[in-house]
Structures are given as structure tokens and as C-alpha cells.
A protein has these predicted regions:
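Arg/Lys-rich, low-complexity, intrinsically disordered basic segments
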Residues: 1-112
Length: 112
């Protein structure tokens, strides 16, 4: 199972020759991944973990963006997760993907 966005072995690196460097999620890598998700949302497709092309929907983009917060908390701790949550919140707001439920979910990640 390949990483979709991060690392030299990621799906993006293999197929697009672009990837987010490093391992683990911090604010810098989250910003890079959000920009790749944005590109996928515009073109209408993405990769799954087997590097096959699949449809990119707003719902999938939202799930992937929110998951960055959980990964940041796991890899770097609560303080970095809060910074990533702010980025994700702004990104979701910019793309009109922010709802009350999503706000609560982001708040739960940051406070838990």
C-alpha cells in the first residue's frame, strides 16, 4: 500500500513526478498535501493506495483533508495538530466544504 502524496515512493511521485518530501505530517507537509488535493479536486480524479486512478469528489477531498489533523497529532503531537487544524479549517472554508459537523469534528481532534 503506497502513500498517495508523501515520499519518493508515493503515487504522486511515481505518476506525476511531484511529491511532498519527508515523512510524518506537520504544518509544512499538510500545506503541500492540501495543494495536491486541490489540484485533484480541480481535475476530478486522484489515486487510491494502489496508485490506481479514482474519482475525486468533494466528500473524498474533505475526508483526506480532515485526516491530516489526526496524522499530525499521531506524528507530531497536539500542538502541531492544532496548526494543521487551522490550515485544514481555512482550506475547507475556502472550498466551501465546511459544515457545522466538520467544525465539531475538527474541534474534537484538536481537544482530544
Amino acid at each position: 500500500m503506497a502513500n498517495i502524496y508523501q515520499g519518493e515512493g508515493s503515487c504522486w511521485a511515481q505518476n506525476e513526478k511531484i511529491y511532498v518530501p519527508g515523512s510524518g505530517i506537520d504544518a509544512r507537509s499538510a500545506r503541500g498535501i492540501l495543494s495536491l488535493i486541490e489540484r485533484e479536486l480541480k481535475r476530478g480524479w486522484t489515486y487510491d493506495h494502489s496508485c490506481r486512478k479514482i474519482r475525486m469528489t468533494p466528500a473524498l477531498a474533505k475526508r483526506r483533508a480532515i485526516y491530516l489533523i489526526a496524522l499530525a497529532k499521531k506524528h507530531r503531537g497536539a500542538a502541531e495538530a492544532r496548526r494543521v487544524a487551522e490550515l485544514v479549517y481555512s482550506w475547507l472554508e475556502k472550498h466551501r466544504l465546511l459544515s457545522g459537523a466538520v467544525k465539531r469534528k475538527i474541534a474534537a481532534y484538536v481537544t482530544a
